Regions:
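Cytosolic, long alpha-helical scaffolding segments
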Residues: 1-154
Length: 154
């Protein structure tokens, strides 16, 4: 339907960029949803278990992921390049948190391998959150393209 509209209406470059950006965003938003569903499934499977460690950094990652997705979508809706840039910059914090979680879990497994199953589940949650952050960055990259006509991969 979008492609037909493009052919019939023959939009100017700015309109075409906005429509093509929206089509690109759909893929990232869908992947964010898939990863959120995967996290929910893991958490559901762990709900009756005693956790091997406090998930302080993972909780921070979750909050950061929500903020990045929200701000990424808001940057597109409002054509806000500054918000897109701020959101892209937050990915460094997300990556650092993931590295911290990964290192903590590796050490936990080294100390007691009986914790490995749950540690792997926690690692998967952290990786999904990190990927959600990456998809939020993609949304921002496409927002900047929509506004400027230049696509820069961060």
């Amino acid at each position: 339907r979008c492609m037909r509209l493009l052919l019939i209406e023959q939009p100017v470059a700015r309109d075409f960029r906005e429509v093509s950006t929206a089509l690109k965003l759909i893929t990232d938003i869908e992947r964010i949803g898939d990863q959120a569903a995967d996290i929910a499934e893991i958490v559901s499977n762990l709900k009756d278990e005693a956790y091997i460690k406090r998930l302080t950094h993972t909780v921070r990652m979750g909050r950061l992921a929500v903020r990045m997705v929200h701000d990424g979508v808001a940057s597109f809706i409002n054509g806000d390049e500054a918000l897109a840039d701020e959101t892209i910059a937050r990915d460094d914090e997300m990556d650092a948190l993931f590295l911290t979680v990964k290192n903590e879990l590796v050490e936990l497994i080294k100390k007691d391998s009986s914790n490995a199953d749950q540690a792997i589940m926690f690692m998967m949650i952290a990786k999904y959150l990190e990927r959600i952050g990456d998809h939020a960055v993609n949304v921002c990259e496409w927002t900047k393209y929509s506004e400027t006509g230049v696509h820069i991969k961060y």
